[in-house]
Structures are given as C-alpha cells and as structure tokens.
C-alpha cells in the first residue's frame, strides 16, 4: 500500500473515519481537506447493492448537473452533411467522419467526449477497441449516439456527466471543483444522487445504496449520511 504524504495525513485528521456526515458538512470538509495546489475536482462515490455481472443489474446513463462540473469539455462529433453543419453551429470542437477515425488510429486523443449520429456508428465501430477501454465509445444510453446533435452538444457543454457501475458495484462521478460554492456542490450532489436512485434495477435486492462518500482529487474521502439529503 502506498504511503500517504504528510499533507494528506494532516488533512485526514479533520475527518472522523467512522462518522457519516450531513451532506453540507461533508462538502465543506472535503474542500478543507483538499491538499492539491490546483482547482481539484470534487467527486461522489456510491457503493451499490447490485451484481454488475448480471445484465439486468447494469447501471449506465448521464445527467446534466445544474451547476456544471467546472471543466470545459472538448467535443468530437462524427456526422455528415447537414448534421455536421449543425454540430459546427452548436459549438463542437471537432467535426468530421473518416478523417478523425484515421487520426484516432494514429494516437490522437485531444477530446473528452464523442457524439456520433447513428449512421456513423459503423465507422466509429472500427475504433471501438481503442475507444472502449478509455470510456470514450459513444452510447445511446448516455445520449451520445443521436441525430439530435445540437441538443447533445449543448448538454455536454452545460455540464453533463456520464456514470456507469464498475465491476465492484461502484459508481464515481464528478460534481464540481473545490472552488465551487458549497451550495452549488450540494445541488449537484443531490441531482446525481436522485438520478442514481431512479436508476435502481428492478432485479436489485436488499440495500441499494450501501455507502456514499465525497472526495477531492488528492484528498481523503468523507462519508455521507443518506438521510441528510434523501428528502431534498
């Protein structure tokens, strides 16, 4: 196990490891315990009572956070004709078809999100083995395979985040930056929490949300008491 730095150890002293905090207090502590010299990302982590090995317990989707993420997303759009023009007008950073397929095959990844029209997925599929492991493959469940190109781009630029349960039953999602006001982080937190609740698979048994915590990029995690925001 890697040894924690002195700043991390000092920051961790601010937090009672066994205590589950009110969400507002958890957000405040997360900001105070941040040790990064840059504007670190604040992230929420859910441990869920699902079995991701079963197809009927997969959880994946996307949600637009009311206060954004604090990160400017670079959007690559695979489209042709009028849809390509629509993407350019909507503010996509890159728009093209086979030319960008070739660039990606050559190791170009100067983008954060891909949007593709359904008719382009045959081409995009050629680089699926490259995009998949990086979490960049467009998917209808996250609204990134669509003919509604302008809407998709606007949502991404406004602060849309994707979430997906991992093999261990966890979901991690950004909710902003440490520079955000506490209230804005709490609002973003409540939005993603409500979204995860609504995404509960019918086949999931027992306790669904087992644990929730908030952390910054280089800071210690802070446990959150679900009852402090479940009614919000």
UniProtKB/Swiss-Prot annotation:
It comes from the Bacteria. Pfam families: Ribosomal_L1. Gene3D superfamilies: 3.30.190.20, 3.40.50.790. One of its GO terms (biological process) is regulation of translation. PROSITE patterns: RIBOSOMAL_L1. HAMAP family: Ribosomal_uL1_B. Binds directly to 23S rRNA. The L1 stalk is quite mobile in the ribosome, and is involved in E site tRNA release. Protein L1 is also a translational repressor protein, it controls the translation of the L11 operon by binding to its mRNA. This is Large ribosomal subunit protein uL1. It comes from Bacillus pumilus (strain SAFR-032). The gene is rplA.
């Amino acid at each position: 196990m890697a040894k924690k730095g002195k700043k991390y150890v000092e920051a961790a002293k601010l937090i009672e490891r066994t205590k589950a905090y009110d969400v507002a207090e958890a957000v405040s502590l997360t900001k105070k315990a941040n040790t990064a010299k840059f504007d670190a990302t604040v992230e929420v982590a859910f441990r869920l009572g699902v079995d991701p090995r079963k197809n009927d317990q997969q959880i994946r989707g996307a949600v637009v956070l009311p206060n954004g993420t604090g990160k400017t997303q670079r959007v690559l759009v695979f489209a042709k004709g009028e849809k390509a023009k629509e993407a350019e007008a909507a503010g996509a950073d890159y728009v093209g078809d086979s030319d960008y397929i070739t660039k990606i095959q050559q190791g170009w990844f100067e983008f954060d999100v891909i949007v593709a029209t359904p008719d382009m997925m045959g081409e995009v599929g050629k680089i699926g083995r490259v995009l998949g492991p990086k979490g960049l493959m467009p998917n209808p469940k996250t609204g990134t395979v669509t003919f509604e190109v302008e809407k998709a781009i606007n949502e991404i630029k406004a602060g849309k985040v994707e979430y997906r349960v991992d093999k261990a039953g966890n979901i991690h999602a950004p909710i902003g930056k440490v520079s955000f006001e506490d209230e804005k982080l709490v609002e973003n937190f409540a939005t993603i929490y409500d979204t995860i609740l609504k995404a509960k698979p019918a086949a999931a048994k027992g306790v669904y949300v087992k644990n929730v915590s908030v952390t910054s990029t280089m800071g210690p995690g802070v446990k959150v008491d679900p009852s402090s925001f479940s009614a919000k």
